[in-house]
Amino acid sequence: MATHNVHSCEFEVFGRVQGVNFRRHALRKAKTLGLRGWCMNSSRGTVKGYIEGRPAEMDVMKEWLRTTGSPLSSIEKVEFSSQRERDRYGYANFHIKPDPHENRPVHEGLGSSSSHHDSN
């Protein structure tokens, strides 16, 4: 299948975004929009990530990252970088990368009732 009109960018969300299920909500939103890429907690207390998809869905996700997030999050600002148009997708789906400063697995599945302790 030929892929065209794929846009991508990196993002970093600042504010109270760790320990409030931000990554899990970002995963759900990205999957709902058909976006691909990843997100993860950073050692700086932010959530970083990469998204790729069609421009209209990318715009919706960027607005969600700026204004919505998870119910308990408090977003101060979002920085977008490395915005470009691509020939094809680089990822098969959207996923949560393991937390660099924790030593436990991250559950990526939606609706998993056994992972409520995840500190996103």
UniProtKB/Swiss-Prot annotation:
Reactions mediated catalytically: an acyl phosphate + H2O = a carboxylate + phosphate + H(+)
pH dependence: Optimum pH is 5.3-6.3.
Keywords assigned by UniProt, alphabetized: Acetylation, Cytoplasm, Hydrolase
Entries under Pfam families matching the protein: Acylphosphatase
Positions carrying N-acetylalanine: A2
Record's compositionally biased regions (Basic and acidic residues): 96-107
PROSITE patterns tied to this protein: ACYLPHOSPHATASE_1 (PS00150), ACYLPHOSPHATASE_2 (PS00151), ACYLPHOSPHATASE_3 (PS51160)
GO cellular component: cytoplasm
Subcellular location as annotated: Cytoplasm
Active-site annotation: R23, N41
The keyword Hydrolase appears for this protein: yes
GO MF annotations in UniProt: acylphosphatase activity
EC number of this enzyme: 3.6.1.7
All copies of domain Acylphosphatase-like, residue ranges: 8-98
InterPro entries in UniProt: Acylphosphatase, Acylphosphatase-like_dom, Acylphosphatase-like_dom_sf, Acylphosphatase_CS
Region Disordered, residue ranges: 91-120
PANTHER family documented for this protein: ACYLPHOSPHATASE (PTHR10029), ACYLPHOSPHATASE-RELATED (PTHR10029:SF3)
Protein name: Acylphosphatase-1
Species this chain originates from: Drosophila melanogaster (Fruit fly)
Protein encoded by which gene: Acyp
